[in-house]
């Protein structure tokens, strides 16, 4: 039999037998049988169902279930039987609706065999401790305000006890490739769950007050709600752009009411929108009025942007959000298709802005991308700052930048990046918040490119980074610091030495003269040095004995030439001392009695020191004409 046919038959049976509660095998499993022969549970804590199993079927009217509160007369609960293949026959009793089910009072139960007039089972229980809540119904799931968030809404089957229940979520990806992956079970805490209020006159979403929890009636009028209809929870940490299935179940909180976990609800599937970061979504404002959003345009696709405003509240609304179309910027006629799509809209500063982008492929498939919500003062885009620099020393730059938005100067932070010529890696520096300049140390005799950008990051305004400024080309000079230092040091030392010498000359002349003689000695007498040199050379001449022997080798002449008359003109005297012009004269010749010069020709003669005048010459030289 098909599943839909089985569902229709079961529904007809339930409609035909409205007073007969069905005890399913799942209910039996959840009650953890084996501790009590008579099992009872309550789904809304306003009803009660009890059952027990017998191995053999008995005729109708054989068994009877009696119940009574303390001090009251026992009453019989109508029984009906179910065939259980494993245990035989199951007898089930659902308390009549007209009989009030009381909480926090002991309830006495008896199972009797009427034919034998024998009590088979006896039990005392509290209805508030045998809870088995039915699963939530009318479950709605959709993406939250953040990428990867799941917002769940449901209606409680028993509104009166919804505040005393806790819920558990079971979910997993619907992708068939991950079918074997274990499902995730998460206990939904009260911090992420809020009750959904049912109000007689719903107000617009933006005018709804913050989440109101159920309270007693106010003395000045009725409460702004009637009953708690259901709940709402926000689950985060999911993967954006994926499809998930989910189930919910409930359990008493264990404080006011106690019991077991109820059955799981039917699975509900939901498709989460993708993260708009993957398409490069960026929204900004220049005047705090108009908001511009841009994203990357893919090939052979069309896209459209949507926006909505919402108020922050602790409980999300169960209504589907209303998205407004963002006004798209049309490309210029004749221009090539833009790689970036843009749209703009007028915003307010008193609500949160949500952005949704729908991309339609060439095959007609629609993919949704959700951006992170933001306030308009968190998306202020600054113009590109201008960078000025000057080199104060070799490799040391003094930087200054100016910005047009002086009203937000103290909340503006900057990023400076630079790189060497021919390199692709950038070094990024972040000056302190609100800085208007700084210094940068670079390598001398090199070329660099510098760029600057800015953004707001203060307590009042925030925003994205601006575009990088045009590259500033910098050529650093040679490193002359050490030359300047050495020159200055030499000048200081020279001046100090000069001042010291002047002071020494004035105060201590004797010491000054000695110091001057030691530092600047007087030039020697060249004549004295030459004479000393000649004397030293003569001392190193051959010994006297050797010269005497050589003189003895010269034999004297036996002829003496005398003049004719003794009245001849006297010759000038020769100097008694030999001249130093002929240092090569033999020492033996210095003692010879050569006192007059020989007669000269008629033209006259003079005394000469030529060595030929002191030697014996051939006779023909002295003959008269």
UniProtKB/Swiss-Prot annotation:
Keywords tagged on the record: Cell membrane, Glycoprotein, Golgi apparatus, Isopeptide bond, Membrane, Phosphoprotein, Receptor, Repeat, Signal, Transmembrane, Transmembrane helix, Ubl conjugation
Extracellular side, ranges: 26-482
Phosphotyrosine modification, residue list: 616, 621
Localization terms from the record: Cell membrane; Golgi apparatus; Cell surface
Bilayer topology term: Single-pass type I membrane protein
GO CC, one annotated term: plasma membrane
GO biological process: definitive hemopoiesis; homeostasis of number of cells; negative regulation of apoptotic process; platelet formation; positive regulation of gene expression; regulation of chemokine production; regulation of stem cell division; regulation of stem cell proliferation
Motif WSXWS motif in this chain: 465-469
Transmembrane regions: 483-504
Post-translational modification: Ubiquitination at Lys-544 and Lys-564 targets MPL for degradation by both the lysosomal and proteasomal pathways. The E3 ubiquitin-protein ligase CBL significantly contributes to this ubiquitination.
Record keyword Disulfide bond present: no
Cited Pfam families: EpoR_lig-bind
Sequence motif Box 1 motif, location on chain: 519-527
Domain notes: The WSXWS motif appears to be necessary for proper protein folding and thereby efficient intracellular transport and cell-surface receptor binding. The box 1 motif is required for JAK interaction and/or activation.
Summary of subunit composition and partner proteins: Homodimer. Interacts with ATXN2L. Interacts with JAK2 and TYK2; these interactions increase MPL localization to the cell membrane. Interacts with THPO. Interacts with SHIP/INPP5D. Interacts with kinases BTK and SYK.
PANTHER family referenced in this protein's UniProt entry, alphabetically: CYTOKINE RECEPTOR (PTHR23037), ERYTHROPOIETIN RECEPTOR (PTHR23037:SF28)
Protein name in the entry: Thrombopoietin receptor
């Amino acid at each position: 039999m098909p599943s839909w046919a089985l569902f229709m038959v079961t529904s007809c049976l339930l409609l035909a037998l409205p007073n007969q509660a069905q005890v399913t095998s799942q209910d039996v499993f959840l009650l953890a049988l084996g501790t009590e022969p008579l099992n009872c549970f309550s789904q809304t804590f306003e009803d009660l169902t009890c059952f027990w199993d017998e191995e053999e079927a008995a005729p109708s009217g054989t068994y009877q279930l009696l119940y009574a509160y303390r001090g009251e007369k026992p009453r019989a609960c109508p029984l009906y039987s179910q065939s259980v293949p494993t245990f035989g026959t199951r007898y089930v009793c659902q308390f009549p609706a007209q009989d009030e089910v009381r909480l926090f009072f002991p309830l006495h139960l008896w199972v009797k065999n009427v034919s034998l007039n024998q009590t088979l089972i006896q039990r005392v229980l509290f209805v508030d401790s045998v809870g088995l809540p039915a699963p939530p119904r009318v479950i709605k799931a959709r993406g939250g305000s953040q990428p990867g968030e799941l917002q769940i809404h449901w209606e409680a089957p028993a509104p009166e006890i919804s505040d005393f229940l806790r819920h558990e979520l079971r979910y997993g990806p619907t992708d068939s490739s991950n079918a074997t992956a274990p499902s995730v079970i998460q206990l939904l805490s009260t911090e992420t769950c809020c009750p959904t209020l049912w109000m007689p006159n719903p107000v617009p979403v933006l005018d709804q007050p913050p989440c109101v929890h159920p309270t007693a009636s106010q003395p000045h009028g009725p409460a702004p709600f009637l009953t708690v209809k259901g709940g709402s929870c926000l689950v985060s940490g999911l993967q954006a752009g994926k499809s998930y299935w989910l189930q919910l179940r409930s359990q008493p909180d264990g404080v006011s009411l106690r019991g077991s976990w109820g059955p799981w609800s039917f699975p509900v599937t939901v498709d989460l929108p993708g993260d708009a970061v993957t398409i490069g979504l960026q929204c900004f404002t220049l005047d705090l009025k108009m908001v511009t959003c841009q994203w990357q345009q893919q090939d052979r696709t069309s896209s459209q942007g949507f926006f909505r405003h919402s108020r922050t509240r602790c409980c999300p609304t169960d209504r589907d959000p209303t998205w407004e179309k963002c006004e798209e910027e049309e490309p210029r006629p004749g221009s090539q298709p833009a790689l970036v799509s843009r749209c703009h809209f007028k915003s307010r500063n008193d609500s949160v802005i949500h952005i949704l982008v729908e991309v339609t492929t060439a095959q007609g498939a629609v993919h949704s991308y959700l951006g992170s919500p933001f306030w308009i003062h968190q998306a202020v885009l600054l113009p590109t700052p201008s960078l000025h620099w000057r080199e104060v020393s070799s490799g040391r730059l003094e930087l200054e930048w100016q910005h047009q938005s002086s009203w937000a100067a103290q909340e503006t932070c900057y990023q400076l990046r630079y790189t060497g010529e021919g390199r692709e890696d950038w070094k990024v520096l972040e000056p302190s918040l609100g800085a208007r300049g700084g210094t940068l140390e670079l390598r001398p005799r090199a070329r660099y490119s510098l760029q600057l950008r800015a953004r707001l990051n203060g307590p009042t305004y925030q925003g994205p980074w601006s575009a990088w400024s045009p590259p500033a080309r910098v050529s650093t000079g040679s490193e002359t610091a050490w030359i300047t230092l050495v020159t200055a040091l030499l000048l200081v030392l020279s001046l100090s030495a000069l001042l010291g010498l002047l002071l020494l000359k004035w105060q201590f002349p004797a010491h000054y003269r000695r110091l001057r003689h030691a530092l600047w000695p007087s030039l020697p007498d060249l004549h004295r040095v030459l004479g000393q040199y000649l004397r030293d050379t003569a001392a190193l001449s051959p010994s006297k004995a050797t010269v005497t022997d050589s003189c003895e080798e010269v034999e004297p002449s036996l002829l003496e030439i005398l003049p004719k008359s003794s009245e001849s003109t006297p010759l000038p005297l020769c100097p008694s001392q030999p001249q130093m012009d002929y240092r090569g004269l033999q020492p033996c010749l210095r003692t010879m009695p050569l006192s007059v010069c020989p007669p000269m020709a008629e033209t006259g003669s003079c005394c000469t020191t030529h060595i030929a005048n002191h030697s014996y010459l051939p006779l023909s030289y002295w003959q008269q004409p």
